[in-house]
A protein has these predicted regions:
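Generic structural motif
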Residues: 2-9, 40-51, 57
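Conserved, short, structured surface segments that act as functional micro-motifs
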Residues: 39-40, 49, 65-81, 224
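Ligand-binding clefts of soluble mixed alpha/beta catalytic domains
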Residues: 74-604
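Acidic, low-complexity mobile loops and tails
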Residues: 1-27
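C-terminal, active-site-flanking charged/polar segments
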Residues: 45-48, 53-65, 503-507, 584-587
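Short hydrophobic beta/alpha edge segments that flank linear recognition/processing sites
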Residues: 18-39, 57-72
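Methionine-biased hydrophobic packing positions in alpha-helices, especially
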Residues: 5, 32-34, 496
Length: 604
């Protein structure tokens, strides 16, 4: 019998005169701190031991001599009992126990407190969001960096996962398939040091964000928490060398990112939420770049957390995209939002398109709800509006056409008559970037008298903000279709049509469409001012003015525009959906992407 590995002879398992069988261990050899069993290749009687314990052996060196004439022909059974698949070894039991103490079941008081406030735990939110059984957790055994202050047993009990539950999962896989359903989830745990960002959970976050960047994995983040954790132990000075915020920002435009906010979300937690494509917040949310302690420390006054950035402030100012009742609804909306970026759905219902003929009033000065047009034009119950209370004159929504995701921008004539103000331009421009980044075609429903003018408008930096729509549209690569519902005047109409009536893949109008370089009343007063002033009789002057305006309206009718080929067609409103579907069918499919199309999606 020869050695099969170089090393030191540790022990003999047989002695001269013993009978051995093939496969029986005859000696132990140690190499590189590991023990190797030397097995007999055949049976027989041991005649001599050829090495002493402690000797260093070379590979293939003879160890003992066997007389094969005494081989009984039986293989060695190993002397092992049948394995019990349910037996838990002590080393595994320790690991199992460490994992168990991170679960909600091991923390009944913390869970009960959370539930008493009408809130879910971090693990409950993730469990409800992801597909059943799909979640694998990274860094579950992490502990807070407070080892000089707290004993390990205390850290295990008080800082499970260091306050950040994170890992990989799928969402909506049954609908879109596992590849499209890939998702990274990260949830700050408010029951652990108020969801603050500790040294170790920063490292965990950085690890996962780097993985999301490498493998292009969409991210959903529950951002509730108080920002940095000042009582953690850090061997450096500032902790400003962490990569967390850079890591999340690098995902912008590469993969969809969603922040869900509930309760208090301040400082670093809020900064991460602000880097995401969309913020979904519950009605109990307060969201700000600093909490009360930091505000007071800066000498800026004393406030309660709920006074800093409540939903009543952060929804109309555009910070929050979607407001929901509670965390359960937030999960459902996040699942739905992710679906628009995962693909088409097979089940859809088209509303009765004939209703579109009656949604824009015959009286041209009567306002209407453009959201009713959106609900009727696109698949039934498929719309999800973003930032509805911010810049309400500009509607931005995700919807579907025969199951295919599309983005919708639309003027709402109930607000400023559909005029585009600075906030509305920002809202539309950012939404264009979002849709283009992820290959979602855009549909523009135009009904605008132009952009907002006047000294008050200029105080909002309209010149710069309004121009964002031109810049964003000029960089689009996705299909862009325009339907003019009624008004299409001046630069506002050009902004809604990607810079020009001829820029979109098609520009069509409903019969109610009216067009001009500016509002006709103003154009007549500007162009015929001297002629009108020369008419002494006020009644005659008004009649001449009204006649000039009527002629301008006649020239600006949609039919006349189409006759001059400034429109692709004037269509029956009931035919709009067919136009959009045929337009989409005529466009090439976007090429598979290995990286991002756009440098990033603007935070604003």
């Amino acid at each position: 019998v020869r050695t099969g590995v170089p090393g030191s002879l540790v022990a003999w398992r047989v002695q001269p005169g013993d009978t051995v069988r093939a496969g029986q261990c005859v000696a132990l050899v140690e190499a590189m701190k590991m023990e190797f069993e030397i097995l007999a290749e055949q049976g027989g009687r041991v005649e001599a031991l050829l090495a002493e314990v402690g000797h260093v052996l070379v590979d293939g060196q003879p160890l003992l001599a066997l007389d094969p004439r005494h081989d009984d022909g039986q293989a060695h059974d190993g002397g092992q009992q049948a394995l019990d698949p349910d037996h838990i070894r002590p080393d595994l039991a320790e690991v199992v126990q460490r994992h168990l103490v991170t679960q909600d079941a091991a923390r009944p008081e913390a869970v009960a407190k959370r539930h008493a406030q009408g809130q879910l735990t971090a693990r409950e939110n993730i469990e409800r969001f992801v597909d059943a059984g799909s979640f694998i957790e990274y860094g579950a055994l992490a502990l807070a960096s407070q080892r000089t202050r707290l004993k390990e047993a205390e850290l295990i009990a008080r800082s499970p996962a260091d306050g950040l539950v994170a890992g990989l999962a799928t969402v909506n896989a049954a609908q879109f398939g596992e590849q499209a359903a890939r998702c990274m989830v990260m949830a700050y745990d408010y029951t652990v040091f108020a969801g603050t960002q500790g040294v170790i959970n920063h490292q965990k976050t950085d690890r996962l964000l780097h993985l999301a960047l490498q493998r292009q994995i969409p991210l959903v983040l529950w951002a509730e928490g108080g920002g940095g954790r000042p009582n953690d132990e850090y061997p450096g000075v500032s902790l400003l060398d962490n990569m967390t915020f850079l890591g999340l920002a690098r995902l912008s435009g590469l993969v969809p990112t969603v922040a869900i906010v509930n309760g208090r979300c301040f400082a670093g937690n809020a900064a991460l939420a602000g880097c995401c494509d969309v913020i979904i917040a519950t009605q109990s949310t307060t969201l700000g770049m600093a909490g009360p302690a930091m505000i007071e420390g800066g000498g800026l006054g004393r406030f309660t957390p709920e006074e800093v950035g409540p939903v009543s402030m952060q929804e109309p100012n555009g910070v929050i995209d979607i407001v929901v009742k509670d965390e359960a609804e937030a999960v459902a909306v996040a699942q739905r939002y992710m679906g628009y970026f995962q693909g088409r759905i097979a089940d859809w219902v088209a509303p009765d398109q004939r209703l579109l003929r009656h949604l824009v009033p015959e009286k041209r000065t009567q306002v209407y709800d453009v959201r009713a047009v959106i609900r009727t034009l696109f698949d039934e119950a498929s719309g999800l509006e973003l930032r509805p209370r911010f810049a309400s004159g500009m509607v931005t929504a995700l919807a579907r056409l025969e199951g295919r995701p599309v983005g919708v921008i639309a003027n709402d004539p109930r607000h400023l008559g559909g005029a585009i103000d600075a906030d509305g331009a920002d809202k539309a421009a950012r939404f264009m970037q979002l849709c283009d980044a992820f290959d979602i075609p855009l549909v523009s429903l135009c009904d605008t008298p132009g952009f907002m003018v006047g000294p008050e408008a200029e105080k909002t930096a309209t010149v710069r903000h309004f121009s964002r729509m031109f810049l964003a549209a000029a960089s689009l690569t996705v299909p862009y279709f325009v339907v003019v519902l009624r008004k299409g005047y001046g630069l506002g109409a050009q902004a809604m049509t990607a810079g020009s009536l001829l820029a979109p893949d098609f520009t069509v109008s409903w019969p109610t469409g009216e067009f001009g370089p500016m509002g006709f009343e103003g154009a007549v007063r500007l162009g015929f001012g001297k002629q009108l002033e020369a008419i002494a009789d006020p009644l005659q002057r008004q009649q001449v003015f009204e006649g000039l305006v009527a002629e301008a309206y006649r020239r600006g009718k949609a039919l006349n525009m189409a006759a001059h080929l400034e429109l692709d067609d004037v269509i029956d409103p009931a035919d709009t959906r067919r136009w959009l579907l045929r337009g989409l069918a005529s466009m090439p499919q976007p090429a598979p992407r290995q990286g991002r199309k756009r440098p990033f999606v603007d935070a604003w």
